[in-house]
Amino acid sequence: MFEVNPVLNKLKELSERTELLRGYLDYDAKKERLEEVNAELEQPDVWNEPERAQALGKERVALENVVGTIDTLTQGADDVAMLVELAVEGEDEDTFNEAVAEADVLETKLVDLEFRRMFSGQHDPSDCYIDIQSGSGGTEAQDWANMVLRMYLRWGDAHGYKPELIECSEGDVAGIKSATIKFTGEYAFGWLRTETGVHRLVRKSPFDSGGRRHTSFCSVFVYPEIDDDIDIEINPADLRIDVYRASGAGGQHVNRTESAVRITHIPTGVVVQCQNDRSQHKNKDQCMKQLKAKLYELEIQKQNAEKQALEETKSDIGWGSQIRSYVLDDARIKDLRTGVETRNTQAVLDGDLDKFIEASLKSGL
């Protein structure tokens, strides 16, 4: 005799959760918008404006993810219920086991969609940048900044975000002083936005002949790439533009000409750099895009900080807030906001950050 009730109960719960998501995610409006986007992309002159066509293509993927998944879940629950009915009628154990497996697959899809619901911020679907800056502490801190850079590059590769090293300034002896990475892909900013803050390393330094324990800090700042139609006024008189010869690891790919660009926004002290192209003009354009995005995100964070101060919320989004502690001697990495920790330090340093990121998103940071 088959255990039918647990499967039917699961299907009922899946259907109820799917209906809730249908409302939360505004399924009807998204389906209507998807039809509009598809119609626009079918126009023969759509590629006369390549940037708009690319934006529409990106929007279509995001809409299809929601609409298609909800359609799959709705139809899938009906199909599995029918399989269960057929299995019971025919006393067919293989068909029943297939139905159980299909129900599990549907639940996985639903959990993934429920998780995506946390990406409700205006810029969560956007590409993003991560700025990494070593703290005080000389070579040890610069080596730590390089470890953090490697960690995020590995994470980006594993998640298909095509990480691109926009700028990297070598350390005096080892490691790096600073770096900027661009992540391209759906919900890049949504995934990474809670990584902003100070990351603290405690270990026996390989650069200390006495093998003493050192504490080093590294600042991480995540900001979304913003649309050109968002108006950020930047007065050219407020900018200091420097050109210099590129430095940093990269072998034959390092730009050896004096085309690297650094732009300082004097009123705020914000600095952006780009050295990944041989064209000074292209590097300057990239710097201006980063500056615009960074000033926008800083303004949003300032507004959020003021709002949170009024509401006395628990989370400090300030640049100086310490978010995670990496104590390598004790084999322990702990998120100071959520309490999540792991002893598999090497896996985390190799880019396995999902446990920490998911916990911070679920807690509404």
UniProtKB/Swiss-Prot annotation:
One Pfam assignment: PCRF
GO cellular component: cytoplasm
Intrachain S-S bonds: none
Modified residues (N5-methylglutamine): Q252
Compartmental location: Cytoplasm
Claim: Protein biosynthesis is one of the keywords in the record: yes
Keywords: Cytoplasm, Methylation, Protein biosynthesis
Entry-linked SUPFAM superfamilies: Release factor
UniProt xrefs under NCBIfam families: prfB (TIGR00020)
Main function: Peptide chain release factor 2 directs the termination of translation in response to the peptide chain termination codons UGA and UAA.
Family: Belongs to the prokaryotic/mitochondrial release factor family.
HAMAP family, A to Z: Rel_fac_2
Protein name in UniProt: Peptide chain release factor 2
Organism: Aeromonas hydrophila subsp. hydrophila (strain ATCC 7966 / DSM 30187 / BCRC 13018 / CCUG 14551 / JCM 1027 / KCTC 2358 / NCIMB 9240 / NCTC 8049)
Upper taxonomic lineage: Bacteria, Pseudomonadati, Pseudomonadota, Gammaproteobacteria, Aeromonadales
Gene: prfB
